[in-house]
Amino acid sequence: MKSIKLRLVIHYLPMIMFTIIASIIFKLFTSVTDTIVFTTDVSGYISVFFLSITLLIGPFNLIFRRKNPLSTDIRRDIGIYGGILAVIHSVVGLFAHLRGRPWLYFVKETETGFVINLDNFGIANYTGLLATLFIILLVAISNNASITALKASKWKTLQRTSYLMFILVIVHSIYYREVLPEKEILTSIYMFIIALIIVIQLVGMRLKLAKG
């Protein structure tokens, strides 16, 4: 395992630089002027990019017949960084559309009180919230202490919730595409990446089963 200082330099610094460059490009090619909306959008897109990489490392190791250890520094750090961006996306996003009334992301106000919001907007937000909770769990156990405390089998079981998290992200993306059609182009690119990940994951699963 590399030292934290070395990981900050060779893992986190390049990811931060990528985030800055991607944010500048996003700013140049979109008409978003609101800082909160911009931060919500860019943190969401970039977080999915990094979280996607963590789901691709395992299948690629199988495809190219490389060792596929329980945990590696690079996969762990990419997951942590992507998870931090996802949490930023979720927190800042609560102030993107309903300024000062974040509860309306999840409930509707009626004459008699509040009811659970189950339209496209509500489903998008509930799936996003659940995905964020799973991400927080995954980030929290992304360390050697958790592997030691939980033991490898239990830790791996919890780690597999990353697949459920990603399904929730897909649903979240689909429903927000319906709610915010003006983001259709970016969301389409987003969905293409997700589809690519699913295909590669299936290839990896097939190779794993064939390997026995």
Residue ranges and their predicted role:
Residues 1-212:
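Membrane-embedded alpha-helical bundles that constitute the cytochrome b-like, heme-associated redox core
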